[in-house]
């Protein structure tokens, strides 16, 4: 087990370093360093989703064709079922097909068609990342094609399936949902440290969150039963508190011989951090929980509480205390 954990950590570090180096190699003369995240984070999300959807791509396209033929208006549920995921893409493109596409404006048009083919939940994440605003700049600087090529590099595997050689032996191990979530969180941490003028607004140190989780759960540890619990963060940022608190509650319940199911809920006013939080949950395979995260510039918890009628079993939060209350919309 210890050896496997070491392998997992080595794999995660290798992938994180690889993606980090893409930013330095491709974006150095195109963006100021503090803006690398605007491209790299959504591209990491795209590559993982693309890899996850690869196995069911044909089934989704067939289902889409059938639904259109029968003039079915509400297609989301059926397409999710065909994909076997909480998301899907109905465009004819994959990143691999885009890699073989022509350069320049043709690649731009094909790439936009690919993005527009994603399910509404992924579209929202990309919109909150303002990713479409980056595309023309990437095309004009002749970087878009190289980025696609880099993220498809055969020496790195962002897929949940292993890469095998011609003899069927595993060349690169699979990257499970927890692994890609850890990679994504590591990239976020590095970007926050690299551009730390506002890092505190987006990131609470993990050891602090772990202490907060203990203060939240330990006083009621003996009362935790094998049941379903809800956990809420009204200023959830990138979702780190929810994730750590969820892990802590599972661990505590296990220590007492209990098995719990946990539903996460959160609200976040910053577009980018909301996008990161939702993307992180999708990458971890927690699509249902991602639906419980709401946010955006018009979603202040103070003036536009999205869970006004809900009650929760636990709440954990670290709101931006330096923000004047009257500046909240």
Where are these regions (language model features)?
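Glycine-rich nucleotide phosphate-binding loop and flanking beta-alpha elements
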Residues: 47, 322-323
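Conserved small/polar residues in nucleotide/adenosyl-binding loops
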Residues: 326-329
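Conserved S-adenosyl-L-methionine
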Residues: 202-317, 322
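Non-catalytic, mostly N-terminal accessory regions of nucleic-acid modification and defense proteins
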Residues: 1-220, 289-301, 306
């Amino acid at each position: 087990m210890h050896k496997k954990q070491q392998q997992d950590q080595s794999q995660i570090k290798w992938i994180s370093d690889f993606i980090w180096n893409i930013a330095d190699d491709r974006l150095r003369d195109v963006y100021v360093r503090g803006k690398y995240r605007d491209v790299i984070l959504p591209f990491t999300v795209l590559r993982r989703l693309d890899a996850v959807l690869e196995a069911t791509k044909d089934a989704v396209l067939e289902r889409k064709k059938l639904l259109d033929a029968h003039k079915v208006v509400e297609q989301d549920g059926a397409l999710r079922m065909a994909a076997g995921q909480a998301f899907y893409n109905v465009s004819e493109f994959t990143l691999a097909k885009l890699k073989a596409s022509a350069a320049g404006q043709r690649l731009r048009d094909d790439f936009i068609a690919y993005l527009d083919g994603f399910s509404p939940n992924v579209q929202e994440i990309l919109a909150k990342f303002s990713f479409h605003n980056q595309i023309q700049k990437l095309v004009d600087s002749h970087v878009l094609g190289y980025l696609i090529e880099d993220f498809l590099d055969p020496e790195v595997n962002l897929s949940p399936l292993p890469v095998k050689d011609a003899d069927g032996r595993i060349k690169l191990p699979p990257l499970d949902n927890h692994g890609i979530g850890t990679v994504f969180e590591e990239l976020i941490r590095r970007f926050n440290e690299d551009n730390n003028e506002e890092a505190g607004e987006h990131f609470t140190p993990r050891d602090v969150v772990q202490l907060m989780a203990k203060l939240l759960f330990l006083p009621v540890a003996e009362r935790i039963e094998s049941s379903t619990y809800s956990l809420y963060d009204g200023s959830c940022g990138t979702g780190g508190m929810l994730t750590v608190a969820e892990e802590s509650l599972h661990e505590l319940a296990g220590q007492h011989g209990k098995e719990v199911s946990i539903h996460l809920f959160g609200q976040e006013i910053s577009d980018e951090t909301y996008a990161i939080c939702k993307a992180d949950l999708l990458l971890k395979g927690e699509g249902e929980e991602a639906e419980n995260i709401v946010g955006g510039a018009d979603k202040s918890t103070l003036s536009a509480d999205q869970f006004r009628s809900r009650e929760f079993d636990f709440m954990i939060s670290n709101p931006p205390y330096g923000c004047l209350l009257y500046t909240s919309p």
